[in-house]
Amino acid sequence: MSHEPEYRDWQQIVELIRSSVDSQQHEMLLTMLMTPDERESLTARVNILNELLKGELSQRQISQMLGVGIATITRGSNELKSKSEAEKDKLKLLLEQVAQVAK
């Protein structure tokens, strides 16, 4: 008897998260899926993308501000470069909206 994992691709994970948001269980799900270090890394990645999209600081300044390596900033920058302007605009708007709610 061979067993296969039920979750095999990224879209299934995205759907799991979407479903957890719909049922107000997203915080519980993400807390259970990610270690404290992973959550900290994800927070850093969000801040990296946010700062890169703002375009006000150099990669070195972002690295110093967030306490992450320059290679981490470069990976975020490379990921952004692979996206269309429309995708970047959507992400920037989403980040701005959430930042306004948090203030």
Curated annotation (Swiss-Prot):
- What subcellular locations does the record give? Cytoplasm
HAMAP family membership: Trp_repressor
Assembly state and interactors?
Answer: Homodimer.
Q: Which family does it belong to?
A: Belongs to the TrpR family.
> GO MF annotations for this entry?
DNA-binding transcription factor activity; sequence-specific DNA binding
Q: Which domain of life is it from?
A: Bacteria
Q: Name one GO cellular component term.
A: cytoplasm
Protein purpose: This protein is an aporepressor. When complexed with L-tryptophan it binds the operator region of the trp operon and prevents the initiation of transcription.
Q: Which residues bind DNA?
A: 59-82
Q: Which UniProt keywords apply?
A: Cytoplasm, DNA-binding, Repressor, Transcription, Transcription regulation
| Pfam families linked | Trp_repressor
This protein is called Trp operon repressor homolog
Q: Which GO terms describe its biological process?
A: negative regulation of DNA-templated transcription
Q: What is its main location?
A: cytoplasm
Which organism's genome codes for this protein? Vibrio parahaemolyticus serotype O3:K6 (strain RIMD 2210633)
